[in-house]
Amino acid sequence: MKELSVNNLLGIKYINENDINLVFETADHFKEVINRPIKKVPSLRDITIANIFFENSTRTKLSFELAQKRLSADVINFAASSSSVTKGETLVDTVNNILSMKVDMVVMRHASPGAAVFLSKNVKASIVNAGDGAHEHPTQALLDAYTIREKLGDVAGKKIVIVGDILHSRVALSNIYSLQKLGAEVRVCGPKTLIPKYIEALGVKVEPNLRKALEWCDVANMLRVQNERLDISYFPSTREYAMQYGLDKNLLDSLNKEIVIMHPGPINRGVEITSDVADSRQSVILNQVENGVAVRMAVIYLLASKIK
């Protein structure tokens, strides 16, 4: 059996193209499984997984839990807001206490960039990063690339533009890493204040004009503005942002070609994307959500096989 080159999924930065393709091949199998009348397999009956979320989540948390249960793993969910973390307990102490209950794998979301890497060096368990601050969100990048592969046949040679708040987005960085490793060309588009200074060092060009970006690309991944991470004003108003960087049906229909529309969610309808675009036939937003379960099943299964 093929194996991942890593024991944890800490970020796309730490895995290679073969790892990504192995996840995709495994996800293909699980996608077939979850479309059966009985959507469950007994693969991980002897594995216990803890979902530890220090930040709010809807899609990612539900997707991971569903993936784990469809693999027949035992699952425990930990909410930091109602735990001893509020009493001053450290991250390592919290996780080690959970691991002492014979937990094999930890899926963690944390507000601090690098939290998953730090944890992997200080506890004995397989760690899956479900998002660490504005750093990485590896499973989102994997499911995004998987969806592009499903829609367009391959990722290599495709042109993808990521539009919006690149500076505060963990999705953007993980997508850049994964798409480049798979042979795609990536550009970003957004207000200058929301483009990180290091972006061109990653081999990514900046296109400040949304129309030009859309005319260039095969796929547009629309990101919301991360208002919860904004400590100052990065643009004059939400209305002006929507006028400059929001994708509406008029703009989409005026292009001389058909492009694929993506969004990692949650959507701020009427800001970065209008409802008639988000719900159009060119949109694969719900496909991304569906594929997230199969991709996360693949990641968990492949990491668990290394524990065994």
From Swiss-Prot:
Its EC number is 2.1.3.2. Keywords: Pyrimidine biosynthesis, Transferase. One of its GO terms (molecular function) is aspartate carbamoyltransferase activity. InterPro entries: Asp/Orn_carbamoyltranf_P-bd (IPR006132), Asp/Orn_carbamoylTrfase (IPR006130), Asp/Orn_carbamoylTrfase_sf (IPR036901), Asp_carbamoyltransf (IPR002082), Asp_carbamoyltransf_Asp/Orn-bd (IPR006131). It holds the Pfam family OTCace_N. Carbamoyl phosphate binds at R59, T60, R109, H137, Q140, G265, P266. Transmembrane segments: none annotated. Gene3D superfamilies: Aspartate/ornithine carbamoyltransferase. Signal peptide: none annotated. GO terms for biological process: 'de novo' pyrimidine nucleobase biosynthetic process; 'de novo' UMP biosynthetic process; amino acid metabolic process. The keyword Transferase applies. SUPFAM superfamilies: Aspartate/ornithine carbamoyltransferase. Pathway: Pyrimidine metabolism; UMP biosynthesis via de novo pathway; (S)-dihydroorotate from bicarbonate: step 2/3. L-aspartate binds at K87, R170, R224. It catalyses: carbamoyl phosphate + L-aspartate = N-carbamoyl-L-aspartate + phosphate + H(+). Belongs to the aspartate/ornithine carbamoyltransferase superfamily. ATCase family. Catalyzes the condensation of carbamoyl phosphate and aspartate to form carbamoyl aspartate and inorganic phosphate, the committed step in the de novo pyrimidine nucleotide biosynthesis pathway. PANTHER family: ASPARTATE CARBAMOYLTRANSFERASE, ORNITHINE CARBAMOYLTRANSFERASE, MITOCHONDRIAL. Heterododecamer (2C3:3R2) of six catalytic PyrB chains organized as two trimers (C3), and six regulatory PyrI chains organized as three dimers (R2). This is Aspartate carbamoyltransferase catalytic subunit.
